[in-house]
């Protein structure tokens, strides 16, 4: 018998893709490469109506394109070798580097442009790797040239290249012409192969193209190597760099020596430290005899220069310091004295002209800088508005810029500390020279550079921008965060503290002063926008003084009680001891009334006992019964307190600790008041940005200590809350309970009817009622338990009921039984969770 012939397996080409290509009817295994690339990069072939395949032989990529592209698509394949015809594919023989191929493509394409250009060509390899790789890169560049001429805007170019030194140059060229360039290696490509595929998407289609970009001589030009980086070798000696480019021609030695004095006199010491292995000392050298006496010339130094390749950074620095000291000793680093150039003094006109030119140049640079900043701000705002990030705020910022160069600025007055004087006086609108010199914003030095003034304006502008950005940030956060909205609502609803009784007389005087001040200001010639702002701020400040002398909302609610209707608003400035005692009695009386309301007789007696005091408590001008009104109001207040006491909940460990301390008597009310006075109580937040104040609130509070018992109490409370059933379970239980109650009510009605029936005896009534009770209390029918019997051993092939099995049964094999047990175990596990 003859030997069975077997096809040669060249480098593993007869793999699974070879047999898959045979089964699918493709001409080569490379068809799966383009299939995998197409799937990875968004199925670009399915969207392409015109496809060009360069170096297409034997035509496997054209077959894939004809299968994946839409119907009636134009597919053109070209190669230097002839190909068999394929359905729905135009093929012709030509060299892609010639003009003949370019003209034939134009003839087939007419006015169309290609959506995708494919290139899977490779030269005949076998000479030398450097030559083969360069030929492949040259072929890829020619394919790119054809693609640039025929691709549509946004088209795709897929090409094969070899990994070589020209790879980065080609990638750079691709990146100039396409928006997205990625290198990939599909699974169908063998690992031993040096080929990789580059996918270039979104062709830019430039109107003007530099011809050097597609010229092989320009693209693959050999550039001279730059100077070798010896600093990395000296200052990072631990990092070894391989000589991937080989060694210099003619230099076949790895060991080099030179003289120490040559190193000292060299202008490039770093390079010599990186190149040489040893520095030789010539004892007869005159310079060495001089520098030998240096204190840096130690035994350690002489040992280091014996072998430079084993030194570290510290040793190299020591050698460089020795070289510097030696050069200073020998006078090699002395600079030559430059001849002094006599400066001719400028005349007065020339000096004025020079200063004028300097000022004009500074002014031009300042205007240019401001213009650039405004353009940058507008660009940022346009981008933000396009992304729907914020509302346009340019109008407000530009409006704020209008009054910046005004004569009078109230912000400046506030910085100088004269705002209080302005508020007190009526016609003071001009600052003194001494006061003007306090702040740099008002006192402008004529000799000061323009940059200082610009910096102040920039600071004000930046502050206004930050405030606007912070307000926009709060608006955006409140839109998307419900907790932040609730926090803002709580902060806005907080009531002000009581600051005392209002003084009507002082308020009227302040109003008159404000009115006179405003009238005088209206008659003045200052009608700028800053003056209006100043007036508004002054009026606001005066009104704030009025508000500070008035009652807060809580105080008004307290003193609106009928008990205080007769109290005179004007209190004496200095009260005697009897007055204070009477006030104390009133407080004690009201406290007792809150705790235990007194009868009307006792209240009248208490009031009559206080007639001798100077302080009039209540003036009963009305004929109504005060006691009944007081009792009703006390009851309403008590019910309101009881209602709100239910809402009080101790939810934090700190609150629980404080509650424990108050309950056990470790702390009193006085202690809590004392704790309220701390370093954060009177922190000055005036004239600070809002965003800074909000951020400081998180840190401007005392961390109060907590106890283990309080933490355990909160933990138990949370555990009890978490132990409650979910809403769905609670609703189901409630429905079940409701149905049970309804059935019980129905049973009661039926039992009542049976009991009212006089025709029946007591025994019959009892039996019927017991029958009804049994119907209500009967348990649900339980499903009969099914016994599982394994069909193995004596039960294998058994027909009929197995021995010893009662009730329902089920014959199963071992696998099914294990599966059933596993399902039960999983269901039980989930039920526990």
Swiss-Prot record:
- Any keyword Nucleus? yes
Name residues in a coiled coil.
Answer: 348-389, 453-481, 730-782
Q: Which UniProt keywords apply?
A: Coiled coil, Methyltransferase, Nucleus, Ribosome biogenesis, rRNA processing, S-adenosyl-L-methionine, Transferase
Catalyzed reactions: a ribonucleotide in rRNA + S-adenosyl-L-methionine = a 2'-O-methylribonucleotide in rRNA + S-adenosyl-L-homocysteine + H(+)
Enzyme Commission number(s) from the entry: 2.1.1.-
Q: Where does S-adenosyl-L-methionine bind?
A: 59, 61, 79, 95, 120
Composition skew (Basic and acidic residues), residue ranges: 477-493, 635-645
Annotated Gene Ontology cellular component terms: nucleolus; preribosome, large subunit precursor
Q: What is this protein called?
A: AdoMet-dependent rRNA methyltransferase SPB1
């Amino acid at each position: 018998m003859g030997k069975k012939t077997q096809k040669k397996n060249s480098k593993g080409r007869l793999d699974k893709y070879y047999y898959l290509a045979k089964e699918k009817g493709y001409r080569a295994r490379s068809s799966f490469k383009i299939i995998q690339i197409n799937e990875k990069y968004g199925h670009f072939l399915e969207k392409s109506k015109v496809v060009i395949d360069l170096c297409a032989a034997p035509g496997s990529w054209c077959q894939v394109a004809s299968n994946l592209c839409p119907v009636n698509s134009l597919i053109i394949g070209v190669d230097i070798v002839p190909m068999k015809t394929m359905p729905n594919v135009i093929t012709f023989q030509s060299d892609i580097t010639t003009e003949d191929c370019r003209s034939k493509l134009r003839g087939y394409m007419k006015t169309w442009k290609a959506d995708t250009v494919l290139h899977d060509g490779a030269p005949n390899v076998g000479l030398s790797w450097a030559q083969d790789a360069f030929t492949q890169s040259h072929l890829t560049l020619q394919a790119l040239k054809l693609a640039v001429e025929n691709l549509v805007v946004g088209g795709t170019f897929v090409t094969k290249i070899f990994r070589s030194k020209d790879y980065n140059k080609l990638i750079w060229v691709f990146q100039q012409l396409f928006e997205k360039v990625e290198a990939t290696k599909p699974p169908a490509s063998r690992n031993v192969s040096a080929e990789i595929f580059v996918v270039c998407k979104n062709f830019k289609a430039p109107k003007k193209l530099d011809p050097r970009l597609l010229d092989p001589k320009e693209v693959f030009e050999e550039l001279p190597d730059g100077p070798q980086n010896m600093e990395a070798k000296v200052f990072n000696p631990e990092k070894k760099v391989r000589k991937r480019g080989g060694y210099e021609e003619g230099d076949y030695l790895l060991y080099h020596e030179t003289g120490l004095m040559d190193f000292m006199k060299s202008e490039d010491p770093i390079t010599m430290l990186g190149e040489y292995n040893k520095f030789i000392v010539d004892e007869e050298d005159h310079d060495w005899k001089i520098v030998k006496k240096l204190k840096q010339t130690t035994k350690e130094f002489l040992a280091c220069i014996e072998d430079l390749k084993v030194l570290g950074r510290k040793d190299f620095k020591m050698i460089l310091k020795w070289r510097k000291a030696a050069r200073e000793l020998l006078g090699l680093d002395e600079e030559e004295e430059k001849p002094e150039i006599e400066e001719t003094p400028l005349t007065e006109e020339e000096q004025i002209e020079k200063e004028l030119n300097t000022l004009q140049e500074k002014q031009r640079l300042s205007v240019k800088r401001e213009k650039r900043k405004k353009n940058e701000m507008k660009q940022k705002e346009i981008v933000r508005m396009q992304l729907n990030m914020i509302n346009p705020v340019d109008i407000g910022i530009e409006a704020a810029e209008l009054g910046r160069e005004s004569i009078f600025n109230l912000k400046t007055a506030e910085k100088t500390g004269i705002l209080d004087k302005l508020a007190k006086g009526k016609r003071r609108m001009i600052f003194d020279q001494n006061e003007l010199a306090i702040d740099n914003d008002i006192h402008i030095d004529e000799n000061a550079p323009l940059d200082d003034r610009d910096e102040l304006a920039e600071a004000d502008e930046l502050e206004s921008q930050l405030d606007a950005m912070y307000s926009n940030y709060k608006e955006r956060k409140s839109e998307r965060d419900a907790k932040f909205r609730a926090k803002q609502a709580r902060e806005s609803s907080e009531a002000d503290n009581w600051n005392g009784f209002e003084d009507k007389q002082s308020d009227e005087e302040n109003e008159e002063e404000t009115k006179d001040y405003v009238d005088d200001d209206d008659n003045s010639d200052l009608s700028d926008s800053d003056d209006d702002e100043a007036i508004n701020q002054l009026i606001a400040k005066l009104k704030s003084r009025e508000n500070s002398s008035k009652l807060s909302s809580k105080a008004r609610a307290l003193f609106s009680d009928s008990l205080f209707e007769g109290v005179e608003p004007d209190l004496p400035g200095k009260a005697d001891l009897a007055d204070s005692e009477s006030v104390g009695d009133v407080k004690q009386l009201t406290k007792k009334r809150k705790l235990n309301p007194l009868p009307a007789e006792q209240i009248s007696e208490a009031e009559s006992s206080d007639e001798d005091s100077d302080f009039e408590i209540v003036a009963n001008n009305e004929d109504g019964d005060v006691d009944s009104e007081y009792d009703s109001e006390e009851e309403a207040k008590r019910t309101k307190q009881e209602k709100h006491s239910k809402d009080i909940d101790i939810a934090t460990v700190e609150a629980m600790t404080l509650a424990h301390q108050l309950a056990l008597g470790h702390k009193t009310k006085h202690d809590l008041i004392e704790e309220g006075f701390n370093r954060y109580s009177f922190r000055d937040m005036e004239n600070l940005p809002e965003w800074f104040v909000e951020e400081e609130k998180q840190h401007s509070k005392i961390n109060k200590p907590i106890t283990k018992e309080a933490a355990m109490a909160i933990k138990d409370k949370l555990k009890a809350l978490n132990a409650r059933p979910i809403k769905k379970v609670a609703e189901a239980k409630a429905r079940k309970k409701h149905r049970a109650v309804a059935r019980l009510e129905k049973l009661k009605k039926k039992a009542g009817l049976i009991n009212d029936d006089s025709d029946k005896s007591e025994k019959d009534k009892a039996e019927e009622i017991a029958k009804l009770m049994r119907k209500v209390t009967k348990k649900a029918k339980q499903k009969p338990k099914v016994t599982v019997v394994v069909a193995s051993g004596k039960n294998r092939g058994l027909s009929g009921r197995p021995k010893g099995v009662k009730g329902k049964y089920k014959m199963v094999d071992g696998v099914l039984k294990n599966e059933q047990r596993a399902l039960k175990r999983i269901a039980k596990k989930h039920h526990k969770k």
